[in-house]
C-alpha cells in the first residue's frame, strides 16, 4: 500500500528518487503515466497491466473509451529504478506535470502520484476546505 507524502528533488537529468519504503514494491518495474490534475501516476507494472486490461475491454465503438485508451497507452512510460531508486522522467512527462526541481510524491493507496511542489500546494489549498464534504459525496457508505 502506498501512503504518505515525500519531497524528493528532480535532478538536472530528469531523475527522481523514489521513497525508499516503496522501492521493493516497484522493483519489478513500474509504469509512469499522465494522470488527472496535471500530475503523474506511478503504478507497479502488475497493477498497471490490470488497469490496461480493464480499459481495453471497453467497446471500441465508444469515442470516449478510444480516447482514454489512446491517451493511457501513449502517455505511459515503463521504468526500472536504478540502484539508488531513481527513475528518469521523460521530457514530455516533466512538461505535462510542470515539474521543477521541487517535487512531491504522494501515496494514493494502490499507486503513487508525482506533483510539482507548488502545484501540489495550490491543489491542497483549493481542495482542503472541501475534503470532508467531498469524502461524504464521493465515498458514500464506505466510511
From Swiss-Prot:
InterPro entries reported in the protein's UniProt record:
MraZ (IPR003444), MraZ_C (IPR035644), MraZ_dom (IPR020603), MraZ_N (IPR035642), MraZ_sf (IPR038619), SpoVT-AbrB_dom (IPR007159), SpoVT-AbrB_sf (IPR037914)
Q: Where is it predominantly found? A: cytoplasm
* Disulfide cross-links: none
Listed A to Z, the keywords are: Cytoplasm, DNA-binding, Repeat, Transcription, Transcription regulation
Q: Which residues form the SpoVT-AbrB domain?
A: 5-47, 76-119
- Entry's Gene Ontology cellular component terms: cytoplasm; nucleoid
Please name the SUPFAM superfamilies in this protein's record: AbrB/MazE/MraZ-like
Q: Which Pfam families match?
A: MraZ (PF02381)
Superkingdom of origin: Bacteria
Q: Please give the coiled-coil regions recorded for this protein.
A: none
Query: GO molecular-function annotation terms?
Result: DNA-binding transcription factor activity; transcription cis-regulatory region binding
Cell compartment(s), UniProt: Cytoplasm, Nucleoid
Where does the secretion signal sit in this chain? none
An annotated GO BP:
negative regulation of DNA-templated transcription initiation
Keyword set includes Cytoplasm: yes
Q: Per its UniProt record, what PANTHER family does this chain match?
A: TRANSCRIPTIONAL REGULATOR MRAZ
**Which family is this sequence assigned to?**
Belongs to the MraZ family.
NCBIfam families from the UniProt entry: division/cell wall cluster transcriptional repressor MraZ (TIGR00242)
Instruction: Describe, as the record does, how this protein assembles with itself and its partners.
Output: Forms oligomers.
- From the Swiss-Prot or TrEMBL record, give the protein name: Transcriptional regulator MraZ
